Amino acid sequence: MITGLIILSVLACMLGGCATVSVNVHNGSDTTAPDADNTELIVFAAASMTETLEEIKTVYEQKNPNVSVTFNFDSSGTLKTQIEEGAECDMFISAAPKQMNQLDITADKEANPDELDYIDPDTRIDLLENKVVLAVPEGNPANVTTFAVMAGDLLEQKILLAMGNEDVPVGQYTQKILKFYDLDEAKLAGEGLITYGSNVKEVTTQVSEGAADCGVIYSTDAYSAHLKAVDTATEDMCGRVLYPAAVLKGSAHPDEAKAFLEFLQGKESREIFEKVGFTCLK
């Protein structure tokens, strides 16, 4: 009987010790949680900025250890919709003024018919300018050499063109180019001569993999994907490709967001943007 009691006591002590260890481990994990003083900035940015902003983030976080930057990269139209639907966001960088205007209460009624009021207009700037280019797969097997050649080959049903959807800025620029050459997009699509991507990265991938004979993308994406750009669209063909940026009125960290926007206009950021082909406007 005594032996049985001793065994039970030892077991109880062992279990008690295990419980203590469990609590200590749990408490220890709490100490590794993010610092309460750390600020997380959430930036919604056009997919074409992925490589440059990730590089800038590394530099910025080294200089500002109490700030972490989280990006949401997608088409500007998708990002604009997510902001409308209440997604948490501190800053928006669009690949075209259209989507920014739709969130700017100071924009005219035609540009913002729903009178949406999401961005702080006092922080809005035109940050960058890009170029729209005609890119081809390695070796250019279809021998598409200019936009004019592309237009002629489409009319002759000789090639497959990759372009962005109509709600994507790069797709909207492409639509303007097709109109410039008096091409009927709906007819071409119906004939199976156009393949679409939901953002510029998808279009770029289609060209890189040779799934299309050519594609209309940004100069910076062609550079990042090591694709040959055989022609560059003029302003007459598709207008200027501007990237506006602004802090949101609903930002949880407006001061930190403004500081990051200021950094995007600084020397270190400019060097990163310009080496891939962006033109810095500020």
What name fits each language-model region?
Residues D90-S94:
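Periplasmic-binding protein-like
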Residues M1-L5:
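Bacterial N-terminal signal peptides that target proteins for export
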Residues C18-K63, N72, G77, T81-E84, ...:
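Exported/periplasmic ABC-transporter solute-binding proteins
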Residues I7-V10, N24:
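Intrinsically disordered and other compositionally biased segments
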Residues C13-G17:
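C-terminal motif of bacterial Sec signal peptides marking the signal peptidase cleavage site
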